[in-house]
Amino acid sequence: MLDIKWIRENPETLDKALAKRGAAPLSSELIALDEKRREHVGKVQAAQERRNAASKEIGKAMAAKDMGTAEKLKAEVGELKDFLAHAEEDERRLSKELSDALSTIPNIPLDDVPLGKDESDNVELRRIGNPHNFSFQPKEHFELGEALGYMDFERAAKLAGARFTVLKGPLARLERALGQFMLDLHTTEHGYTEVMPPLMVRDEAVYGTGQLPKFSEDLFRTTDGRWLIPTAEVPLTNLVAEEIVDMKGLPLRFTALTPCFRSEAGSAGRDTRGMLRQHQFLKVEMVSITDAESSVAEHERMTACAEEVLKRLGLPFRTVVLCTGDMGFGAQRTYDIEVWLPGQNTYREISSCSTCGDFQGRRMNARYRPEGEKSTRFVHTLNGSGAAVGRALIAVMENYQQEDGSIHIPEALQPYMGGLTRIEKAA
């Protein structure tokens, strides 16, 4: 959430930033709401002050046995109480109107984010590794998985409908191995603390990270009103909600391997075959909580941690910076890491690393107190996939496929596979 004081002082900056995102100007509307609220707050405060003063005057009048004045003052206090009963309710309503309006405004892109309308305007930063030249026509992961007998979409549809997968045998173990490998890398070498968070959260948590109120259609809700997490970013970031974090403990770095649940409401007709776009999928998430001065450097560090996963797996990838029109709602800047999929002959996103500034910190009311200062500041937050486990499975299958349809297991994963070096067709 953006600061209304900052908006009052920088209306043109806000409107220019919204234009970069392809959105209409909103500063005048927000400032008008704020002025209406502030004017009303002024009237309420004046009435409260007069009520308190009149109440004291009643005591003085009674002490002086000036009953006429006392009765007039009592009548005035009664009128003020009646006014305040309605006015304070109106104040809460006006404050909510402003808060609701602010909650739908996206974050301000950093100055170095490239301008653009959609993913075609994203800018490639680097490529690591060269795509393998196969001596045969490489297959897509679902062709490989079904032929091996370890990937079952038909039974998954029987159980749950479209966009689900049943993995069996060594493919199920390979997905588990990938998640464990990523967690071990981030916790033992990258300094992240592993967390096992709830998979269901309250409204406040999903609001804090920015999925609510604007993107509720992308989420699954339980019958008792909780939300299935679309990413572990939600519970990990909200660990510090409504807290003042010790400055000496920053940055806080958390990681988790969790199932994620998404409705894919806007994805009709896209990636309908295979595991690329699922309602339920495994993902390793990284979250950092930092001070204002450290967040830019932390973004580069987090992205490097995600890239290291693919380097260790020997998977070709490229890193791009998203343009203003393709960034997520809460991001100031986002790097996407795209892995090479030979079956599709293209790069596909496997990790997205974003710095959010104090956007989420303000929504969560999460603060820190800089050393030597009395006042607090909102924390800066960052999140990144480290990485999407299902997509990593796809990438390993397609990049390590053999002409006979078997899958070679990358060396980094073999210790997690009980020494197995190849996945072959089920007997």
From Swiss-Prot:
What EC class does the entry list? ligase
Instruction: Please list the residues that bind ATP.
Output: R262, S263, E264, E349, I350, S351, S352
Oxidoreductase as a keyword?
Answer: no
Which SUPFAM superfamilies does its entry note? Class II aaRS and biotin synthetases, tRNA-binding arm
Q: Name its pathway.
A: Aminoacyl-tRNA biosynthesis; selenocysteinyl-tRNA(Sec) biosynthesis; L-seryl-tRNA(Sec) from L-serine and tRNA(Sec): step 1/1
Its Gene Ontology biological processes?
Answer: selenocysteine biosynthetic process; seryl-tRNA aminoacylation
What family does this chain come from, according to its entry? Belongs to the class-II aminoacyl-tRNA synthetase family. Type-1 seryl-tRNA synthetase subfamily.
What does the UniProt record say this protein does? Answer: Catalyzes the attachment of serine to tRNA(Ser). Is also able to aminoacylate tRNA(Sec) with serine, to form the misacylated tRNA L-seryl-tRNA(Sec), which will be further converted into selenocysteinyl-tRNA(Sec).
**Protein name according to UniProt:** Serine--tRNA ligase
Designated gene of the protein: serS
